[in-house]
Amino acid sequence: MQYVYIFIGGALGALLRYLISFLNTDGGFPIGTLVANLTGAFIMGLLTALTIAFFSNHPTLKKAITTGFLGALTTFSTFQLELIHMFDHQQFITLLLYAITSYVFGILLCYVGIKLGGGLS
């Protein structure tokens, strides 16, 4: 049954990722990928903190959200491909801005999620 929950979570995450991708319409800064990855980082941090209080009794739901939903929502491979595309087009400032923003804010939002989740549990 766990696989069904992961499948459903993955389908929902993929659908949301697809909808967010429409933010990338101008061919410039890939805001859709950034939004998807930063949202995923925050939710992962939040769920990590809530695991002790809530998800210890619901491990299948945790797998559905983390492995399924967040696994499909976030996209490290697209992020890497976009960085290579920027490099190939000599968009070095945009490349650095995107990479630094993604990593720094990803870590920061994951941390905020952990702290917020700790306060809720």
Curated annotation (Swiss-Prot):
Entry GO terms, CC: plasma membrane
Its biological purpose: Fluoride-specific ion channel. Important for reducing fluoride concentration in the cell, thus reducing its toxicity.
Native source species: Staphylococcus aureus (strain bovine RF122 / ET3-1)
GO molecular function, one term: fluoride channel activity
Lineage, uppermost ranks: Bacteria, Bacillati, Bacillota, Bacilli, Bacillales
Entries under NCBIfam families matching the protein: crcB, PRK14201.1
Name of the protein in question: Fluoride-specific ion channel FluC 1
Pfam family, one: CRCB
The reaction(s) this protein catalyses: fluoride(in) = fluoride(out)
